[in-house]
Design a protein with these regions (language model features):
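Hydrophobic beta-strand anchors of alpha/beta hydrolase catalytic cores
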Residues: 56-57, 87
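Active-site loop/turn elements of alpha/beta-hydrolase fold enzymes
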Residues: 61, 92-94
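Short, internal strand/loop/helix patches
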Residues: 88, 103-137
Length: 163
């Protein structure tokens, strides 16, 4: 956490603040509405099924160079977190085959398809990549617009701190 004071570093939010989250409005902190999207195999996955542990929802597109650059660090984070939290990558791509070039079945992150972009619209997402950290109760705690390196230690500490 370069540039952060030792007081900030020692707070529970310190690791999250090191990732430079974007401000949230009061309404954004409300309970996230449930959604259900197909994964790469076509199986429907709901946000409700992920509740009870932290969830990082990251909106992605194959035509977005920063998204493609960010994807390996999301995979690494998902592998590091294991069952402690969920990393859900939500793709707005219409072409499932394009998406399969970047993620294989059995990916450590859950890869979901939002071809209609209804879920991304419900989050107010219009820039990619954009990620939201949701606590176990289903409330958005942090929003991150633009690419991040999710493989840094602060990312795992931030998410694990919400358990």
């Amino acid at each position: 956490m370069q540039g952060a004071s030792s007081t900030v570093k020692s707070t529970a939010a310190g690791p999250c603040l090191a990732l430079h989250p974007n401000p949230l409005s009061a309404t954004a902190r409300a309970l996230v509405p449930d959604f259900e999207l197909p994964d790469l195999s076509g199986k429907k996955v709901s946000l409700r099924s992920m509740r009870g542990r932290p969830v990082l929802v990251s909106f992605f597109a194959t035509w977005c160079p920063p998204c493609v650059e960010e994807a390996p660090s999301l995979e690494a984070l998902a592998g590091h977190l294991g069952d402690k939290a969920t990393v859900a990558i939500v793709s707005v791509d219409e072409d499932r085959n394009a998406l399969k070039k970047y993620f294989i079945q059995g990916s450590r992150a859950i890869v979901l398809r939002d071809e209609s972009q209804k879920v991304s619209a419900s989050f107010g997402t219009f820039k990619f990549p954009e990620s939201f950290l949701i606590d176990p109760a289903g409330k958005i705690r942090y929003a991150f617009i633009n690419k991040r390196d999710w493989s840094v230690a602060e990312a795992a500490a931030c998410i694990e701190g919400l358990r």
